[in-house]
Regions:
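Bacterial Sec-dependent N-terminal signal peptides
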Residues: 7-15, 21-52
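Pepsin/retropepsin-fold aspartyl endopeptidases
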Residues: 47-426
Length: 426
């Protein structure tokens, strides 16, 4: 998800489209969906000390915000500090008949975290207004990308730094809100916060940190602050190549879609400790094998730090003074945990009746059973996955022991696999 702005407009083949009226019934359905999705969140916020003007979010490895496009169109976006502006999901537009709702289109070339060359995508070249909380932004160019192929059905779009980080931004993972502040930020209000060594360049944020793999392997330097990543720490291919990992326990992982730009390959290992303000021990990290994209070589950072680390803090990002302030928030985190099902899936019940297998660990229980990337899981222990709500997914299914997966293969055949879910992959 990092470096989503790496695109060059190749052509200005603009087509004039008449702006379509939004059908009342369609909008009501979408509004009802959003109201139901965020109802529990807003009920909680009413009891929490959320500042006036703050933007509440649901945290599910990413920060999900409710917003509105052009005053009328509901949209759920995530905040990604590895991106610049507004991006919209292709299936969100198609399923809601919004393909031509935001004016003229052009073509762009765009890269990202995936392991492939930059790809051609459609863009809206007319400005799109987005309202997020009490904040209004006009987005000049809006790429149309396949975000749901990366994160699943509950994402409609993505919002980057150009809009949300135009002034000091408070991010409270403990209370679930963002809040923009006027500059200068009142530093005297940051009691118990720690200031990180940081740099703000090219609309991105890097911080200093160190990673000790074992007694023979360590890296120290700049890491990208990436709220668009749900992982702990992901090293670039170049940083990975500098290490001696041959004798270390490791798990090979590959995905069909690892980010904008295609699939990805990496190895997971356990690092002895990761040090920033605090020291985290026994951390599961990713070591990229990608030859292209944001985690390849030649990058001005050693890797990216994702939300498995940042969610343990409340933060203030201040682009005016190029400062990052953090305070531990009491959460224990999952940075020492790795997969027990040995596969990665995402919910695509918006377009089919199941969860699509997007990633597999080499030699893991899922691969050994016969599950393949691209398979559609339609039931777990005879329970249709369409019945499993987003809230239940966020809490975790806590699968243990003998577990039956009913799967639809690429040829349409329905097969049941039995996995014994117990051990972490690494």
């Amino acid at each position: 998800m990092a470096e989503l702005n790496e695109f060059l407009i190749l052509s200005s083949r603009l087509c004039n489209f008449e702006k379509v009226e939004m059908q009342f019934v369609l909008l009501m359905k979408k509004l009802l969906y959003l109201i139901c999705t965020f109802a529990a969140l807003f009920a909680l916020k009413s009891h929490a000390a959320v500042p006036e003007g703050a933007i509440p979010f649901i945290f599910d490895s990413h920060l999900y915000l409710q917003a509105t496009l052009n005053d009328t169109v509901p949209v759920t976006v995530i905040y990604d500090t590895g991106a610049d502006f507004l991006y919209l999901d292709e299936d969100y537009l198609k399923l809601n008949n919004l393909q031509n709702a935001f004016g003229r289109k052009g073509v762009a070339k765009m890269g990202g975290a995936g392991n492939s060359e930059p790809q051609r995508v459609e863009i809206f070249v007319d400005s799109v207004e987005i309202r997020c909380g009490e904040l209004d932004y006009w987005n000049k160019i809006t790429p149309i990308i396949r975000l749901r192929d990366i994160l699943g059905r509950y994402i409609d779009g993505l919002l980057g730094n150009t809009h949300l980080l135009s002034s000091p931004l408070e991010i409270s993972f403990s209370k679930g809100y963002l809040k923009q502040w006027e500059a200068p930020f009142p530093v005297d209000s940051l009691e118990n916060y720690h200031k990180l060594e940081a740099r703000f360049e090219d609309n991105r944020i890097d911080v200093k940190a160190s990673l000790q793999i074992d007694s023979a392997n360590a890296v120290e330097g700049w890491f990208r602050l990436d709220l668009g990543s749900g992982s702990t720490v992901s090293l670039t291919n170049e940083a990975t190549s500098s290490l001696h990992l041959d004798d270390m326990p490791k798990a090979y992982f590959r995905t069909q879609v690892g980010g904008v730009g295609g699939g990805s390959e990496d190895v997971e290992i356990r690092a002895a400790r990761f040090c920033m303000v605090d020291t985290f021990e026994n951390v599961v990290i990713d070591c990229s094998l990608n030859e292209k994209g944001a985690l390849s070589s030649g990058r001005p950072y050693l890797g990216i730090i994702g939300n498995d680390i940042w969610s343990l803090y409340d933060m203030v990002l201040d682009p005016v003074s190029s400062s990052v302030w953090v305070k531990r928030n009491g959460k224990k985190g999952t940075y020492s945990q790795s997969s027990t099902t040995h596969m990665a899936v995402f919910d695509r019940t918006d377009i089919c009746d199941g969860w699509i297998v997007n990633g597999l660990y080499k030699g893991g229980i899922a691969e050994q059973a016969g599950i393949e990337i691209g398979d559609v899981i339609i039931a777990i222990n005879d329970r249709p996955v369409k019945e499993i709500s987003w809230e239940e997914q966020r809490k975790g299914l806590n699968l243990k022991g003998e577990t039956k997966y009913t799967v639809r293969k690429a040829n349409g055949e329905v097969v049941t696999y039995t996995l014994f879910v117990q051990k972490q992959i690494i």
